[in-house]
Regions:
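Class I S-adenosyl-L-methionine
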Residues: 1-111
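C-terminal target-recognition/interaction regions appended to catalytic cores
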Residues: 80-386
Length: 386
């Protein structure tokens, strides 16, 4: 609608302009865009690791973006929040590396490149959170690390009333380094005459007003009774939204589900007793070793964990990992069953007949898919439906 008002409407990645963060944003305006884009070849790139290394110095810290140095004691907001708990680590790892729908991400984040995009809001267990190794575990970034990744000088102060408000200030900002280069293009600075901020003798004085210390993020101690659980089962995650998952419908009814199809047309089938009765004779007829003992042991261990039981421990303050242990054991059991069946004798048309359509991805993974139908339908009936 307003396109005619601007000569330039283009998406830029700030990492191309030396910011140690991948940050793609649309910019509209009137400036020499070809000149701006030509700067990319002359701008030195900074990786995530360089930022972390600079900020870990004990005596003198050098600003990785602007090049000036100040005593480490003068740098504020370097306090780290508590490491992720084991449950928080598992949730983050699964959300990033085995998300039920979206593409996989690294966990922890890779340091040999610019960081992922800093966001204004993220919790300790969000897919968007940037997670790095810490002593004895994993942690989120502190305020200063985020500020430097966003291009703010070491001496810049964030006068927020809370930890979350400072995160919002940083995450909602336009990187100063990108605006510097846009301004240089508007000044028509030639590419070969361009100076990087580190070479421009820039120094941002420390303000006289002291920044208020923030209460750092901590693990949750209480969870609502309606806390949700939605995670794919190990060995039953096939990418592009195709997966078996354990989740709690209506916040209390726990069950295994199977999803397939495209991102625009997700489908599912019911993992119920009828499906189990259809699959069981085929599986048992073609088994090459006895795996029923493992299944019976699994059912026996979780016989007292009804849907309510799983929900009770999932919202408990102790952060009992029962649900994750359950899906891990289920995944191991799936792997054992897959290796105990003579699959050559099972018709490739079985899956298309069950879902009433042909699906190459499901057929290519028929061993795991059919095992999932068999085992998870049984567990829905014997454990979760009680």
């Amino acid at each position: 609608r307003f396109r005619k008002l601007f000569s330039v409407i283009e998406v830029f990645d700030s990492a191309d302009f030396g910011l140690p963060q991948h940050r793609k944003r649309m910019i509209a305006g009137d400036f020499p865009v070809d000149l701006l884009n030509s700067y990319k070849t002359q701008i030195p790139k900074i990786n995530f690791s360089e930022v972390l290394k600079s900020l870990s110095a004990k005596k003198t810290i050098r600003d990785p973006n602007y090049g000036f140095e100040i005593p480490a004691d003068d740098v504020t907001e370097l306090e780290n929040e508590a490491n992720l708990t084991d449950i928080e680590t598992r949730i983050n790892r699964d959300a990033k590396t085995f998300h039920t729908i979206y593409n996989n991400m690294s966990f922890p984040d890779k340091l040999d490149r610019p960081s992922r995009t800093i966001t204004a809001t993220c919790t300790r267990v969000s897919r968007e959170s940037i997670i790095i190794n810490s002593s004895n575990g994993f942690r989120r970034l502190n305020i200063r690390e985020k500020g430097v990744l966003q291009g703010f000088p070491l001496t810049y102060q964030f006068y927020g009333n809370s930890y979350s408000s400072k995160n919002k200030m940083i995450g909602n900002a336009v990187p100063p380094i990108l605006t510097y280069y846009i301004f240089q293009s508007m000044l028509e600075t030639k590419t070969l005459e361009l100076k990087h901020p580190r070479d421009s003798s820039y120094f941002h004085n420390i303000p006289n007003e002291k920044v208020k210390p923030s209460k750092l993020g901590m693990p949750n101690k209480k969870y609502p009774a309606s806390r949700t659980f939605k995670f794919a089962v190990p060995h039953l995650r096939f990418g592009s939204g195709v997966r078996f998952e354990l989740s709690n419908v209506a916040k209390t009814k726990w069950s295994f589900k199977f999803f397939y199809g495209s991102s625009k047309n997700i489908k599912s089938i019911s993992l119920n007793n009828d499906l189990f009765k259809l699959i069981e004779p085929i599986i048992l007829k073609n088994k090459t070793s006895n795996f029923e003992v493992t299944i019976n042991d699994l059912i026996e261990e979780y016989k007292d964990y009804t849907s309510k039981g799983f929900q009770d421990v999932w919202v408990s303050q102790s952060e009992n990992a029962v649900a994750f242990k359950f899906i891990d054991l289920v995944g191991s059991c799936v792997n054992e069953i897959v290796n105990s069946i003579n699959w050559d004798k099972i018709n490739d048309d079985l899956i298309p007949n069950i879902i009433n359509e042909k699906n190459k991805k499901l057929t290519d993974n028929k061993e795991s898919i059919l095992t999932g139908f068999y085992l998870l339908s049984l567990l829905n009936t014997k454990v979760l439906s009680k």
